[in-house]
Amino acid sequence: MSIKNAVKLIEKSKARFVDLRFTDTKGKQHHFTVPARIVLEGPEEWFENGQAFDGSSIGGWKGIQASDMQLRPDASTAFVDPFYDDVTVVITCDVIDPADGQGYDRDPRSIARRAEAYLKSSGIGDTAYFGPEPEFFVFDGVEFETDMHKTRYEITSESGAWASGLHMDGQNTGHRPAVKGGYAPVAPIDCGQDLRSAMVNILEGLGIEVEVHHSEVGTGSQMEIGTRFATLVKRADQTQDMKYVIQNVAHNFGKTATFMPKPIMGDNGSGMHVHQSIWKDGQNLFAGDGYAGLSDTALYYIGGIIKHAKALNAITNPSTNSYKRLVPHFEAPTKLAYSAKNRSASIRIPSVNSSKARRIEARFPDPTANPYLAFAALLMAGLDGIQNKIHPGDPADKNLYDLPPEEDALVPTVCASLEEALAALKADHEFLLRGGVFSKDWIDSYIAFKEEDVRRIRMAPHPLEFEMYYSL
């Protein structure tokens, strides 16, 4: 969509406001809202100059001594917000550093743009396609509190396995999925059909093509909405829009949606499998006549991801909660291997009917990942594999959780904690710096920023510690 078409959308919808959105390092969207008349008074100038804001108020960004930042709207992203009472056109923005007029080196969307530019400049390909699958839970309610004398959380979900013995307005229907029993049953066990359909209707209205929606494995209403792939920056934009729609539709239904990887103990967590392929001159470079129909280029791309996986974990699995999901036997891929069939491997090659659909699927990321950063980092790791012809070795076509100890010890794993992942990123990040995609300043500031998460968890007594140690 051009500036001209964005202006037409504002005029045709009779929008009262324009909502400018951007994403911080953690992956959370922020927004500033301006009256639509300001845009219409001089659209070309407004789209060029954007909106100034205080960058020091965004965690992990500028200090207060040099905090001026600029939002530059991307007209191609404009859509009418489906939730606001007053008609409002939403536009996603790049964050610009006024010092040089370029994308701020800590702005996730600018990093993603630089990754796309680096792919083209490398000569390897001209387009990278990404197709994430963010899973999520929808609960009836959640309570949590942390204080110096009290720490607790409690999830309320009529569809949770733990609710079988509860009185619910004097009646308990009994229809709910068991632990690990939530995958695609019909109603009344699947109580989220209408909710998901409402989400899908809005997503399709925003131009995000939905391919399927269904309940997922976890009890307590775990869900997935599968959407079509797109180019890197566009697909990251759509992932942010998806999260916004999912959380707001749930809110309007009187429920609460979360993308936490592991909100429920003892059941499957939520991942964000990321499908990827590289194209050049209209040809899929991952299609070939090798293992599972892959080309050498695709195998080298896999090799790069496996080589750098522990460093990638700091970006693709950026929360302390991420590593409560990445444990064996909960359908979470912990083994750094690849396979055409084996879902215990961290890289899977989906079965497809066409060479155009040939792709690889990274299964270890989760939806707390900032999509701009995660997709850019995965691409950079894969490109390093292609550039240096890093072969991933033989595929792993047997259950990696059932290997004998001597074989199991030979298969590398993803990180076991955020602390380990940050240490890996500190030691292995040169591949991210190529083409100026990520900066050394970003690496250092990101590690320091996320180490605060590690510190907070390390300093907080856990209720399980009282169970295990209080009476010793």
From Swiss-Prot:
Catalysed reactions, as listed in the record: L-glutamate + NH4(+) + ATP = L-glutamine + ADP + phosphate + H(+)
Cross-referenced InterPro entries: Gln_synt_N (IPR008147), Gln_synt_N_sf (IPR036651), Gln_synth/guanido_kin_cat_dom (IPR014746), Gln_synth_cat_dom (IPR008146), Gln_synth_gly_rich_site (IPR027303), Gln_synth_I (IPR004809), Gln_synth_I_adenylation_site (IPR001637), Gln_synth_N_conserv_site (IPR027302)
Keyword flag DNA repair: no
Activity regulation (UniProt): The activity of this enzyme could be controlled by adenylation under conditions of abundant glutamine.
Positions bound to Mg(2+) 1: 133, 273, 361
Residue sites binding ATP per the record: 211, 275-277, 343, 348, 356
An annotated GO cellular component: cytoplasm
Subcellular compartments: Cytoplasm
Single GO BP term: glutamine biosynthetic process
Modified residues (O-AMP-tyrosine): 401
Enzyme nomenclature, EC number: 6.3.1.2
List of residues binding Mg(2+) 2: 135, 216, 224
Domain GS beta-grasp: start-end pairs: 13-101
GO MF: ATP binding; glutamine synthetase activity; metal ion binding
The protein's enzyme class: ligase
Cofactor detail note: Binds 2 Mg(2+) ions per subunit.
Keywords: ATP-binding, Cytoplasm, Ligase, Magnesium, Metal-binding, Nucleotide-binding, Phosphoprotein
NCBIfam families referenced in this protein's UniProt entry, alphabetically: GlnA
Subunit details: Oligomer of 12 subunits arranged in the form of two hexameric ring.
Record-given protein name: Glutamine synthetase
Source organism: Neisseria gonorrhoeae
